[in-house]
Amino acid sequence: MLDILVYLYESFRMAELAPDRDALEKRLFAAGFEEAHINATLDWFANLTSSAAHDRLAYAQYRHYAPEELESLNDACREEISYLVGAEILDPESREWVISGLMALAGEDIEPDHVRWMTLIVLWSRGLIEHFTHLEEMLLNHEPGRLH
């Protein structure tokens, strides 16, 4: 899933509009992605992008992780998420979408780089990335605790 999301981000981050779903499916299939992964990813992404139009929900600033989240997200990943919230890069709602995306990576070993990519994808898809100058460079090239 993350490979497909990164591909979409890299292909369409500068575009005003991405192609429709059918065109995306064909393009992703031609790029070598499996149909089941394409459909699951595009379904998750459609939910994410449709939520951007809704009123922001009130989420708690601090989060307690469910047992399955604790199992999937190691200490480094949870610290990265906490750091991004503390640095005001992720608001609580975006944090929930990042966690949702990470949990959808079922079976993968999730690392802090996955958290950073998912953060970029969530902020980009929700139209929030423009609020942060050089966010892509900062997120992908920082050492924990050195993002300023």
Curated annotation (Swiss-Prot):
Which is a Pfam family this sequence falls into? DUF494
Q: Note the superkingdom of the native organism.
A: Bacteria
Tell me which InterPro entries the record gives: Smg (IPR007456)
Against HAMAP family, the record matches this protein to: Smg (MF_00598)
For this chain, the family text in UniProt reads:
Belongs to the Smg family.
Alphabetized PANTHER family for the sequence: PROTEIN SMG
Report what the protein is called: Protein Smg homolog
